[in-house]
Each structure stands twice: as C-alpha cells, then as structure tokens.
C-alpha cells in the first residue's frame, strides 16, 4: 500500500497536480469516457483541486468547469473556464449558487466528496452514502439528457440501494476501484452514463396513439415529446403498452394485448 501511495503522491508533485486523487479521475475517464472536449463539468467536493485540474484539461478551452467545496480552493494560475464556489452542498443556497455558476445545466457531474472519518465503519459508510445521494440529487437537477455522473461511496450495507437508484437514472452504470485508490480503502466509484430524462418510467402502463413508423418497422408514439417505440403497431393504431426500456431520448414498449 505504501509504495503505491508514495508513487501517486510523488507523481502528483512532479506533474503539478494538487492531489494524488487527480489520477483517480484520469483513470476513471480513461476507462469510461465521461469527460470530453467542450464539456460543462460540475465537481462536488473539489478541494484542493486535483479533479478540477483533470476536468479542465479534458474539457479544454471550450469547456466550463465549476468546483464546489466548503473548504477554500486556492486560485489556479489560469482560471480560464474554471469557477469555484465555497459552500456546503447540503444547503439549498449553495446548490443554487452552483446551478447559477453552471448556467443551469451540465454535461458531467463528478463527486469525490467524503465525510470526516470517525473510525466507526458503519457510521462512515452511512455518511458517505448520504453525500453520494446529495451528489445524485445534484446530477438529477443539472444533467441534460445523455449526461454523465461519477460519485465516490464507501462500500457497505446501503450501497446496493444507492446503486439501484443510480441505475434508475442512467442507461449504463458500472462500479470501479481505480488503481490510484489505496489498497486498504473501501471506496468505490459509481459511473453513470447517458442520463435518462423521460416523463415515464420502466414498467409504466400507457394507452398511446401510434403517430409514425420507425426505420425498422416499429410504431412510434410520443408522450410529452418523448419518443416511444412499440413493437407490432402501425401508424393510426391506439394501443395499451408497458414501458420496457428507457434511453436518454427514446424508449421501448410492448403491447399488453400480446399482438
């Protein structure tokens, strides 16, 4: 553990990153492609700024990066495209300031927030889940359809419930422990890609009118502007359906009459 810790600590000093945690985001992005040129990124729990540096590098000159932490974040040599907010993300005022700084929406929300450690594992785990849920709520508020999410959480009894809630929000979800994490750490990162913004949920039942036909012959219905593909339905049909799968901009449904 010590050798790996020293490796990333020394590497961060040599390469000018403010923390060894910068390599965690690098490795997560290398594996899952959550950051991209021109992206609008919100970084929660951003102090001292290692993740901000990586996000700014990968978003590039056309990107916008907003970092928030209750601790002060020392100004960067170049702040082009980078803004920091000092405050507590559990407070409504801070959340509003972040929304304002991000101009109301973001392509990516990342969170490396962690609780003050007590040494009591169950308590530390519960607090980390609480922070992760705060980050998820921020992602719900800020992410456009197709947006991405990365959040740190300590493994434990409440993890699966949190994971299930994240899976409800994103088309792709994975967990990963990057090499830059310490060997003895229980931290995991959950990656959610392609945020689903839909007026419906999987399992919902609806009566819909088929208004068009897709390239593969599926019927197309629209619910509050959201596109729903329905098997074995023709334009002009009115059918009862069950929603089976949701993507950021479209979903799929099956007819309930078995046609």
Curated annotation (Swiss-Prot):
SUPFAM superfamilies: Nucleic acid-binding proteins, S-adenosyl-L-methionine-dependent methyltransferases. GO terms for biological process: RNA methylation. GO terms for cellular component: cytoplasm. The active site is at 152 (proton acceptor). The keyword rRNA processing applies. The keyword Cytoplasm applies. It comes from the Archaea. Its EC number is 2.1.1.166. Pfam families: FtsJ, TRAM. Residues 199-257 form the TRAM domain. It catalyses: uridine(2552) in 23S rRNA + S-adenosyl-L-methionine = 2'-O-methyluridine(2552) in 23S rRNA + S-adenosyl-L-homocysteine + H(+). S-adenosyl-L-methionine binds at residues 49, 51, 69, 88, 112. It is found in: Cytoplasm. It is an enzyme of class 2 (transferase). Keywords: Cytoplasm, Methyltransferase, rRNA processing, S-adenosyl-L-methionine, Transferase. GO terms for molecular function: RNA methyltransferase activity; rRNA (uridine-2'-O-)-methyltransferase activity. Its main location: cytoplasm. This is Ribosomal RNA large subunit methyltransferase E. The lineage of its organism: Archaea, Methanobacteriati, Methanobacteriota, Stenosarchaea group, Halobacteria. The gene is rlmE.
């Amino acid at each position: 553990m010590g050798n790996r810790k020293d490796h990333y600590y020394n590497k961060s000093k040599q390469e000018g990153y403010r923390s060894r945690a910068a390599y965690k985001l690098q490795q997560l992005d290398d594996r899952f492609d959550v950051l991209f040129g021109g992206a609008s990124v919100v970084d929660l729990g951003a102090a001292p700024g290692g993740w901000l540096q990586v996000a700014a590098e990968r978003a590039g000159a056309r990107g916008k990066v907003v970092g928030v932490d209750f601790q002060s974040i020392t100004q960067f040599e170049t702040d082009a495209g980078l803004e920091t907010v000092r405050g507590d993300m559990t407070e409504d005022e801070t959340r509003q300031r972040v929304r304002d700084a991000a101009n109301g929406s973001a392509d990516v929300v990342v969170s490396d927030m962690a609780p003050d450690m007590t040494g009591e594992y169950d308590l530390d785990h519960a607090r980390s889940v609480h922070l992760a849920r705060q980050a998820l709520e921020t992602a719900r508020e800020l992410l456009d359809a197709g947006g991405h999410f990365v959040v740190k959480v300590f493994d434990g009894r409440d993890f699966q419930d949190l994971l299930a809630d994240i899976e409800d929000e994103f088309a792709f979800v994975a967990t990963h422990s990057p090499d830059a994490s310490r060997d003895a750490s229980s931290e995991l990162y959950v990656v959610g890609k392609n945020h689903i913004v839909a007026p419906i949920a999987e399992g919902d039942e609806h009566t819909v009118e088929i208004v068009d036909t897709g390239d593969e012959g599926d019927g197309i219905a629209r619910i509050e502007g959201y596109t729903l593909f329905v098997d074995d339905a023709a334009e002009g049909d009115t059918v009862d359906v069950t929603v089976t799968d949701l993507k950021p901009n479209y979903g799929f449904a099956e007819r309930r009459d078995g046609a």
